[in-house]
Amino acid sequence: MPKNKGKGGKNRRRGKNENESEKRELVFKEDGQEYAQVIKMLGNGRLEAMLFDGVKRLFHIRGKLRKKVWINTSDIILVGLREYQDNKADVILKYNADEARSLKAYGELPEHAKINETDTFGPGDDDEIQFDDIGDDDEDIDDI
């Protein structure tokens, strides 16, 4: 039997994510790129998102982002449109909440874009649930 002369497993190779606190430079869209908001995660590196011009498309998460950057619903992403397939596109970059707010402040994202909320797209009134008190407060459980 050979001796274990290694220095650890895959967790050691993976290292620590110390660069999360560092701010990166804000990336704006170029030709052939658009901003979108994630509607639904489909699995297998795919997701459904709505471009801010109103078109819903199927998106593919590229290999560089696949297991390193976690994308959730209502995230703002930068996508590269495909010239040969109109209904599909590729995810290039995921913006965090601060970067998305900056994009909105610069006028890159429309005003109706909701950044940190689960309800996506469109100016909608906030539906609040109202509960009515049906029973008497004096009524005791033992009296029923």
UniProtKB/Swiss-Prot annotation:
**Highest taxon listed in the record's lineage:** Eukaryota
Query: Family per UniProt?
Result: Belongs to the eIF-1A family.
The coding gene here is: EIF1A
Question: Which keywords annotate this record?
Answer: Cytoplasm, Initiation factor, Protein biosynthesis, RNA-binding, tRNA-binding
Q: Which Pfam families match?
A: eIF-1a
Q: Which ranges carry the S1-like domain? A: 22-96
TM annotation in the entry: none
Record field: compositional bias (Basic residues) = 1-15
Gene3D superfamilies, per the entry: Nucleic acid-binding proteins
The biased composition feature labelled Acidic residues covers 124-144
Q: Which HAMAP family match?
A: aIF_1A (MF_00216)
Question: Its Gene Ontology molecular function terms?
Answer: translation initiation factor activity; tRNA binding
- Assembly: Component of the 43S pre-initiation complex (43S PIC), which is composed of the 40S ribosomal subunit, EIF1, eIF1A (EIF1AX), eIF3 complex, EIF5 and eIF2-GTP-initiator tRNA complex (eIF2 ternary complex). Interacts with EIF5; this interaction contributes to the maintenance of EIF1 within the open 43S PIC. Interacts through its C-terminal domain (CTD) with the CTD of EIF5B; from the location of the start codon by the 43S complex until the formation of the 80S complex.
Bias regions of kind Basic and acidic residues — which residues?
16-26
**Which compartments is it annotated to reside in?**
Cytoplasm
Per its record, how is this protein called by name?
Answer: Eukaryotic translation initiation factor 1A
GO cellular component terms, A-Z = cytoplasm
Query: For the region Disordered, what residue ranges are annotated?
Result: 1-26, 114-144
Main localization category:
cytoplasm
Role this protein plays = Component of the 43S pre-initiation complex (43S PIC), which binds to the mRNA cap-proximal region, scans mRNA 5'-untranslated region, and locates the initiation codon. This protein enhances formation of the cap-proximal complex. Together with EIF1, facilitates scanning, start codon recognition, promotion of the assembly of 48S complex at the initiation codon (43S PIC becomes 48S PIC after the start codon is reached), and dissociation of aberrant complexes.
